Curated annotation (Swiss-Prot):
This is Lipoprotein-releasing system ATP-binding protein LolD. PANTHER family: IMPORT ATP-BINDING PROTEIN (PTHR24220), LIPOPROTEIN-RELEASING SYSTEM ATP-BINDING PROTEIN LOLD (PTHR24220:SF689). It is found in: Cell inner membrane. One of its GO terms (cellular component) is plasma membrane. Keywords: ATP-binding, Cell inner membrane, Cell membrane, Membrane, Nucleotide-binding, Translocase, Transport. Belongs to the ABC transporter superfamily. Lipoprotein translocase (TC 3.A.1.125) family. NCBIfam families: LolD_lipo_ex (TIGR02211), PRK11629.1 (NF008639). It is a peripheral membrane protein.
């Protein structure tokens, strides 16, 4: 018997209404992501990539279709249940790191654990281990303003992975970095995938970086067109 996919989205659509006018952002998007798989969705700005990630992460609800993650239909869960899934089983990385400026790197990484009810001492220890995993074991006491752009994004990655999620959703995670740091971040994601078995779904406009992942799909005008070329 085949193992159930980690993520299955079926005929996913999203539209917005202004008066009598409907604007479709996503149209009948369907695909599956296996456990431990790294997949890229490639497309230009405005193609619907970020909207898709919001639906997959339970941050928004689709107009039509369904998102099934670890056997649960996310868009049928209550807001509280979706929030619990996001905290415990999903990680998020964005183009801008969204670190809390008044907290150290260590405190930023520990935050999801504390929100989930972990004891402070255990949260700090786990966060320290995660910072070491991304090569920042000596930078934990620094605040975001004292870190380079690449270091801030590594802290954001550590925060996304600190709860050992099954899946990390990454929205243009290297879009704000120079080429050297972008290469380094994609290399790090690959290492974490191999070491921890975490699945990654990365949206990006950079096909060359996307080709480092296991699979690439192209999105255009809100529709998936198949393998990116």
């Amino acid at each position: 018997m085949n193992e159930t996919p980690l993520l299955h989205c079926s005929r996913l659509s999203k539209r917005y209404q202004e008066g009598k006018l409907y604007t479709y952002v996503l149209r009948n998007v369907s695909f599956m992501l296996e456990r431990g798989e790294m997949m890229a969705i490639v497309g230009s700005s405005g193609s619907g990539k970020s909207t898709l990630l919001h639906l997959l992460g339970g941050l928004d609800e689709p107009t039509g279709g369904e998102v099934i993650f670890e056997g649960q239909q996310l868009n049928k869960l209550s807001s509280a249940a979706r929030a619990m899934v996001r905290n415990r089983r999903l990680g998020f990385i964005y183009q801008f790191h969204h670190l809390l400026p008044d907290f150290t790197a260590l405190e930023n990484v520990a935050m999801p654990l504390l929100i989930g009810g972990a004891r402070p001492a255990q949260a700090q220890e786990t966060a320290r281990e995660m910072l070491a995993a991304v090569g920042l074991e000596k930078r934990g006491h620094h605040r975001p303003a004292e870190l380079s752009g690449g270091e801030r994004q590594r802290v954001a990655i550590a925060r996304a992975l600190v709860n050992h999620p099954a899946l990390v959703l990454a929205d243009e995670p290297t879009g704000n970095l120079d080429q050297r740091n972008a290469d380094s971040i994609f290399e790090l994601l690959g290492e974490l995938n191999m070491r921890q078995g975490t699945a990654f779904l990365v949206v990006t406009h950079d096909l060359q970086l996307a080709k480092r992942l296991h699979r690439q799909l192209e999105m255009r005008d809100g529709a998936l067109l198949g393998a990116a070329q």
